[in-house]
């Protein structure tokens, strides 16, 4: 078995057997990997709390057929503040689900860096976590080649009204007045200003996403619906928000 060293962020931790955990880790150089940390739930485990969900770690592991086996782990940043507040944790879990859906196992340092910056923004912020989650999902969709259309109607390219707009996930964007009269069944109305806020989120650095106010739930719904309609791994979003980083 080949031994390797990597850096990654723990996305999910699931109990396995009497003392082990199976971890999904998004790594900087290899994308998503699934590992087993043996004995991690024992009181005197050598891993301690270094492999908690959303921790950033350097680790060593042996490659296996289905699961790699972690032998060492060093904490680089625990992001403990993300786990200590439910609203932060829910946003982080939502981001993990979107990452699973859009990136899968594909390695991309830009994705790793985006996730790290998003967790940093969640931990340092006091509010606006839904905006951070929406910004992360939107930017990751762009990186992954699944960007929604924000410059006009998804069907005809015409102007989208500020009021009475509808979002059509399968079409990949918003609908103008003419096209919304024949809107697909998956479309839904959005509050005034939703398209404008999405355009702002696309342009703003992720660290500034929480500065906006209002429309958090609408933005999260739009981004999530878009990912569900287009991402190859969208089934990972079928679980309720909050379970992606949880510890059943």
UniProtKB/Swiss-Prot annotation:
Gene Ontology BP term (one): DNA recombination
Pfam families: RecO_C, RecO_N
Keyword line: DNA damage, DNA recombination, DNA repair
GO cellular component terms listed in the entry, alphabetical order: bacterial nucleoid
Keyword Signal tagged: no
Family membership noted in the UniProt record: Belongs to the RecO family.
Reported function: Involved in DNA repair and RecF pathway recombination.
Protein name, per record: DNA repair protein RecO
Species name: Rubrobacter xylanophilus (strain DSM 9941 / JCM 11954 / NBRC 16129 / PRD-1)
Originating gene: recO
């Amino acid at each position: 078995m080949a031994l390797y060293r990597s850096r990654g962020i723990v996305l999910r931790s699931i109990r396995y057997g009497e003392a082990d955990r199976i971890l999904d880790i998004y790594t900087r150089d290899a994308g998503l990997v699934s590992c087993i940390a043996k004995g991690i739930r024992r009181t005197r485990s050598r891993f301690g709390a270094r492999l908690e969900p959303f921790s950033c770690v350097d680790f060593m592991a042996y490659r296996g057929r289905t699961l790699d086996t972690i032998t060492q782990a060093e904490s680089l940043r625990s992001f403990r503040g993300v786990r200590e507040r439910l609203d932060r944790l829910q946003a982080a879990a939502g981001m993990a689900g979107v990452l699973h859906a859009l990136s899968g196992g594909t390695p991309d340092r830009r994705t790793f860096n985006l996730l790290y910056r998003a967790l940093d923004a969640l931990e340092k912020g006091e509010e606006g976590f839904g905006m951070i989650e929406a910004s992360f999902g939107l930017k990751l969709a762009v990186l992954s080649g699944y960007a929604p259309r924000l410059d006009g109607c998804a069907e005809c390219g015409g102007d989208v009204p500020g009021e009475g707009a509808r979002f059509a996930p399968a079409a990949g964007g918003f609908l103008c007045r003419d096209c919304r009269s024949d809107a697909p069944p998956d479309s839904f109305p959005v509050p005034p200003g939703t398209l404008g806020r999405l355009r702002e989120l696309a342009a703003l650095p992720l660290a500034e996403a929480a500065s906006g106010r209002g429309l958090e739930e609408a933005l999260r719904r739009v981004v999530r619906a878009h990912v569900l309609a287009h991402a190859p791994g969208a089934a990972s979003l079928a679980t309720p928000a909050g379970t992606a980083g949880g510890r059943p």
